[in-house]
């Protein structure tokens, strides 16, 4: 496996989910975020002690956005042919095997990735354990 290229430190400015106002108070109000539009809304007016709204300031650094902790970006792979794309980019991208790939095909994809020196983010998914 190739080590990733040097990159700035990955900083996640906000890891908690943004919850909808009053979702904790009323069961009928789902937790999925909705922008407050009311003229008197304390959340929209950013009063102290209220929940925070998603804003542009919470965004990640453009260079580290979508990066895994190892420093690679993921590329979805469904078959062995998809791995050929990553041959020249082993320090930047890591393969992620799609969820609809059978366990038989996963074994062959993992073997080919190891031969090419490509990092796989989910190598243990759907593999039968031998007892």
UniProtKB/Swiss-Prot annotation:
Keywords in alphabetical order: Ribonucleoprotein, Ribosomal protein
GO BP term, example: translation
Pfam families assigned to the protein according to its UniProt record, in alphabetical order: Ribosomal_L32e
Gene Ontology, cellular component aspect: cytosolic large ribosomal subunit
Top-level lineage group: Eukaryota
Gene Ontology MF terms: structural constituent of ribosome
Keyword Hydrolase: no
UniProt-listed InterPro entries: Ribosomal_eL32, Ribosomal_eL32_CS, Ribosomal_eL32_sf
Entry similarity comment: Belongs to the eukaryotic ribosomal protein eL32 family.
Cross-referenced PANTHER family: 60S RIBOSOMAL PROTEIN L32 AND DNA-DIRECTED RNA POLYMERASE II, SUBUNIT N (PTHR23413), RIBOSOMAL PROTEIN L32 (PTHR23413:SF1)
Protein name: Large ribosomal subunit protein eL32
Gene designation: RPL32
């Amino acid at each position: 496996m190739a080590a990733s290229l040097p990159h700035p430190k990955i900083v996640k400015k906000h890891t908690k989910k943004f919850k909808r106002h009053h979702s904790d108070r009323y069961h009928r109000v789902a937790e999925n975020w909705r922008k407050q539009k009311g003229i008197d809304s304390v959340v929209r007016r950013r009063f102290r002690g209220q929940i925070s709204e998603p804003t542009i300031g919470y965004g990640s650094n453009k260079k580290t956005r979508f990066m895994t902790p190892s420093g690679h970006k993921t590329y979805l792979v469904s078959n062995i042919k998809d791995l050929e794309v990553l041959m020249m980019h082993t320090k930047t991208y890591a393969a992620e095997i799609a969820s609809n790939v059978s366990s038989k095909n996963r074994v062959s994809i993992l073997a080919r990735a190891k031969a090419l020196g490509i990092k796989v983010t989910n190598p243990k998914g759907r593999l039968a354990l031998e007892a």
